[in-house]
Amino acid sequence: MTTTLQQRSSANVWERFCTWITSTENRIYVGWFGVLMIPTLLAATVCFIIAFVAAPPVDIDGIREPVAGSLIYGNNIISGAVVPSSNAIGLHFYPIWEAASLDEWLYNGGPYQLVVFHFLIGCACYLGRQWELSYRLGMRPWICVAYSAPLASATAVFLIYPIGQGSFSDGMPLGISGTFNFMIVFQAEHNILMHPFHMLGVAGVFGGSLFSAMHGSLVTSSLVRETTEVESQNYGYKFGQEEETYNIVAAHGYFGRLIFQYASFNNSRQLHFFLAAWPVIGIWFTALGVSTMAFNLNGFNFNQSIIDSQGRVINTWADIINRANLGMEVMHERNAHNFPLDLAAGEVAPVALTAPAING
């Protein structure tokens, strides 16, 4: 009798737990994806804060030249970062228990892997949680599809790119100036500015900003007047009201006359789908571009494309960019290379075997 009651009681506890996890009445929805998302994001956040503030220098290039990234080692908010794990570790999984000591784990940049792996798992679960909540509420599932763009970007720079380059030391540092350094080195090694997928991403981000500003300003300029001049116009809207709060016909008429008729949407659903799809598709392409450049399928190379009748090179902007790329490449990881491969791979210059006679 006791055993039966105990089993029934434990079953009731599990059922109550399942009901609470999947309840849409909670102030913040947890969901089954949230069961994994919450601890992973908490672990990533706590480790990031501790490492950003107090982590010792990391031997990022694997040449016994540690690079300091934390605040207590002299950095500020802009220059500080969680430094990527050492090139000596490469692509090896490097949890705490794989190191001989905690000092070794810190010296080889173990916190970077801990933060990145937990962060990516947590972000993937956040996407799943968006789908799960949409499903519970009977909504369409496109919110998580839109979120897949920044998730794909994070996965590209933190996981796919290091895999393609053969080491997590090539991943993006977790800091402001570290992000800029990653971008500069990426341009130097892969010529990303000349990659069509990056161009589509630029069009997506800048175009999305433009369309967002256009939409917001048009809506704000065509609000239906519900208040007096001494009241805020925001009081003219009541949450959940059935009436339109702005006049889409007026907005359509204005923009159609400003540009031309068919440049303006006359269907609100088409308009908002476009506003979501444009930046998402652009960022998808950029993430795909980074993922292909990870395996050295780089941007277009138009260096020395124009030659005159005498065989002399006529420089174009492509050659200017190439010279900048070479300059950036020889400056990064300055002590890790005997000679940059891109410079060493050029044509061999003739060398005189005998010194010319100098009549003096």
UniProtKB/Swiss-Prot annotation:
A Pfam entry, by short name: Photo_RC
Entry's transmembrane regions: 29-46, 118-133, 142-156, 197-218, 274-288
Residues annotated for pheophytin a binding in this entry: 126
Reactions catalysed: 2 a plastoquinone + 4 hnu + 2 H2O = 2 a plastoquinol + O2
UniProt xrefs under PROSITE patterns: REACTION_CENTER (PS00244)
Site-annotated residues for Stabilizes free radical intermediate: 190
EC number: 1.10.3.9
Keyword Transmembrane helix attributed: yes
Chain sites annotated for binding Fe cation: 215, 272
One Gene Ontology MF term: oxidoreductase activity, acting on diphenols and related substances as donors, oxygen as acceptor
Membrane topology: Multi-pass membrane protein
Residues involved in chlorophyll a PD1 binding: 198
Main location: membrane
Binding site for chlorophyll a ChlzD1: 118
Residue stretch(es) of the prosequence: 345-360
Residues carrying the site annotation Tyrosine radical intermediate: 161
GO cellular component: photosystem II; plasma membrane-derived thylakoid membrane
Similarity comment: Belongs to the reaction center PufL/M/PsbA/D family.
Any further remark recorded for this protein: Cyanobacteria usually contain more than 2 copies of the psbA gene.
Protein name as catalogued: Photosystem II protein D1 3
UniProt source species: Trichormus variabilis (strain ATCC 29413 / PCC 7937)
Lineage of producing organism: Bacteria, Bacillati, Cyanobacteriota, Cyanophyceae, Nostocales
